């Protein structure tokens, strides 16, 4: 730990990383506060900030030669086989680590690798290469299984803890496994933080973008007060301000053979309203809609739009065009609505729900990985980051209010490399609720633009459904409407 006065150059360097956000750190009294320029307080500067050689410092940091927390169960023959690009990452990491050790810099690296790159297996290879006792920290239980599978494949002795940290501490008094896989809420326990700081050298923070380290969270406090000897942040979408805690980044671009298509399923709707809708519309401009809660609530009861989504999914699934579908909503009640209707159509052997309130959901996710055809309905919160179903070939985005980081993570769910190359995303830019029509169009255009400009998707118009079912709610009723539809499409590309 280093308590320093906030001199101008130090403040400028830290503030630059926040990209306009307030800069918040722990002060000498242990309070987590916003840092003001010229402050007379001393602040706890995160160890990982000094990982970059561009940061000038006279501080000298410990190296691995000062500890003896070595893995005992390592077997070199169990090292996973890597693709050439993954081996390139390993080579870059090893090279950077050598330079850090020579210059006595903290061994902290962010692995900024695309969704589907294989961050888990690459990191397990690095873990075995370092041969140091490791803590793997995940944001939720759903990510445990993919780490468990890879750690077991490497043959490392490990312990998984997802519930009570107190019972884990009792077990650690008599045994000290080479690898601990834990959920991040364990870091709220100071005794546990002290234990892993003393007995484990490598700390892996999976899905690091899910933590805002400018907030006073358990992870923030751990990295500030109990900084590990070595640390990896893993993410496909780095949060800029988090770089203050891990200021060295390796980013290797990944070329893909996947054929990625995004369809904007357009339709003209007659205005639709109910007493409930009229009540919620009144709240659109109020403080209760600060985070667009009522915007999403209105979408969840937009019956014509919901029916269009169902009609499109049913037709595509029945035709065999898509086979392993992820349906994403923002709100739980919206998820349940789609689940019940799809369950009535296809039955429980095909339709599954990814419900955060159901403790059996992680086991269910494991079971559907081997299915050739399924429909998995879930929320952005539960399945938008880290969902490990590599065989997914299609995504239906039913919500609209999604930030860029969430969009990239969500689209990454269908960008895992498998032998099947076609990937399809469906978005629905129209609504029958006139008060949010333009807002929804703008939000959906952001999803389309990011998918095309950054993630390599190709946008195509979706006409099949409208032409094949003239009686459905999504049909256009006249030639004039069809012409207007084409004009609208051209303006929004």
Curated annotation (Swiss-Prot):
Its EC number is 3.6.4.-. The keyword Transcription regulation applies. Its main location: virion. GO terms for cellular component: virion component. The keyword Disulfide bond does not apply. ATP binds at residues 113-120. One of its GO terms (molecular function) is DNA binding. It is found in: Virion. Residues 100-256 form the Helicase ATP-binding domain. A motif (DESH box) lies at residues 206-209. CDD domains: SF2_C (cd18785). Keywords: ATP-binding, DNA-binding, Helicase, Hydrolase, Late protein, Nucleotide-binding, Phosphoprotein, Transcription, Transcription regulation, Transcription termination, Virion. It is an enzyme of class 3 (hydrolase). Belongs to the helicase family. Poxviruses subfamily. Interacts with OPG087. Might be part of a transcription complex composed at least of OPG087, OPG110, and OPG145. DNA helicase which seems to act as a postreplicative transcription termination factor. Involved in ATP-dependent release of nascent RNA. Forms a stable complex with single-stranded DNA, and to a lesser extent RNA. This is Transcript termination protein OPG145. It comes from Vaccinia virus (strain Western Reserve).
């Amino acid at each position: 730990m280093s308590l320093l006065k906030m001199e101008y150059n130090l403040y400028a360097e830290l503030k630059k990383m926040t990209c306009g956000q307030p800069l918040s750190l722990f002060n000498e009294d242990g309070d987590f506060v916003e840092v003001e320029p010229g402050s007379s307080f001393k602040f706890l500067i995160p160890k990982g900030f000094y990982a970059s050689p561009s940061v000038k410092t006279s501080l000298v940091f410990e190296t691995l030669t000062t500890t003896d927390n070595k893995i005992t169960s390592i077997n070199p023959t169990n090292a996973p086989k890597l693709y050439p690009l993954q081996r390139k990452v390993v080579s870059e990491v090893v090279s950077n680590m050598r330079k850090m050790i020579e210059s006595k810099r903290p061994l902290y690296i962010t692995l900024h690798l695309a969704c589907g790159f294989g961050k888990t297996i690459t990191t397990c290879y690095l873990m075995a290469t370092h041969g140091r006792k490791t803590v793997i920290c995940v944001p939720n239980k759903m990510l445990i299984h993919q780490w468990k599978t890879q750690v077991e494949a490497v043959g490392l002795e490990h312990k998984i803890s997802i519930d009570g940290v107190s019972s884990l501490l009792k077990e650690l008094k008599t045994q000290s496994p080479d690898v601990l896989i834990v959920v991040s809420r364990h870091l709220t326990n100071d005794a546990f933080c002290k234990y892993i700081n003393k007995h484990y050298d490598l700390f892996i923070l999976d899905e690091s973008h899910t933590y805002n380290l400018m907030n006073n969270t358990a992870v923030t406090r751990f990295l500030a007060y109990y900084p590990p000897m070595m640390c990896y942040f893993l993410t496909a979408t780095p949060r800029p301000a988090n770089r203050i805690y891990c200021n060295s980044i390796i980013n290797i671009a990944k070329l893909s053979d996947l054929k990625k298509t995004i369809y904007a399923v357009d339709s003209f709707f007659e205005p639709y309203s109910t007493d409930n809708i009229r009540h919620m519309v009144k709240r659109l401009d109020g403080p209760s809609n600060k985070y667009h809660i009522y915007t999403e609530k209105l979408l969840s009861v937009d019956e014509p739009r919901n029916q269009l989504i169902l009609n499109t999914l049913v037709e595509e699934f029945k035709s065999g065009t898509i086979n392993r579908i992820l349906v994403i909503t923002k709100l739980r009640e919206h998820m349940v609505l789609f689940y019940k209707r799809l369950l009535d159509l296809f039955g429980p052997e095909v339709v599954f729900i990814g419900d955060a309130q159901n403790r059996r959901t992680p086991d269910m996710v494991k079971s559907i990985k081997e299915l050739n055809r399924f429909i998995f309905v879930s929320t952005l919160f539960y399945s938008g980051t880290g969902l490990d179903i590599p065989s997914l070939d299609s995504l239906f985005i039913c919500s609209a209010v999604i930030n860029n980081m969430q969009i990239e993570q969500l689209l990454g769910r269908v960008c895992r490399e498998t032998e099947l190359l076609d990937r399809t995303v469906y978005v629905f830019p129209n609504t029958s609720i006139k008060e949010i029509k333009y807002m929804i169009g703008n939000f959906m255009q952001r999803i389309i633009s990011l998918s095309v400009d950054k993630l390599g998707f190709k946008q195509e118009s979706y006409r099949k459904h409208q032409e094949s079912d003239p009686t459905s709610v999504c049909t256009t009723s006249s030639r004039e409407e069809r012409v207007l539809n084409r004009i609208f499409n051209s303006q929004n590309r």
